[in-house]
Amino acid sequence: MKLKSLALTALFASAAFVGQSVCAQTLARTSALVTQADGAGGFNAHFGDTFAAATSGNTFSDVFTFNVGNSFDSAASLTSSYLNTSLTKDLLITGFSLYKYDPASMNILGNAIAGVNNTLPGTHPTDSWSLSAFGLTGGSYALKVDGRVVGSGGGAFGGDLAIAPVPEPETYGMLLAGLGVVGFLARRRKTA
């Protein structure tokens, strides 16, 4: 009799552990951005992700990688959308950042640049985030989007990245020399 109750107790205890393992998981995805030249030496890229209804309750961490050869300035924006109903927020974006990383080890180099949450107050607003970074050096970079799928219909987010080259120091020297020549000619005309 004692053996039966001991076995039954062990069965219930193991069932409790099995029940705890069925919890929300983190969905992690990494993909390279497809860039398009903008005709002015920089480039643009679009990024995003869609989550099925079965992922409701899960958190996510999406990483979008890109490489830049020279110094650059960047700006990015991110919004979420309603998939299931316009009355219930489907995604909750909790973080948006840009960082430089080592492609061999995937380690972050230096500090990440955090995005700004521009989401308006109210009931179930659409997420809106922005990010700006200036004077960054060339190398491998990544945009990271963190969040949680809260709607019963899944969810989606999308964003844009714009990269503009930073002028080389020689360009500033030529600019100053040109302004000096213009100033000299203007002064010469005034005295003549």
Per-region residue spans from a language model:
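Mature extracellular "passenger" or substrate-interacting domains of secreted, surface-exposed proteins
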Residues: 25-165
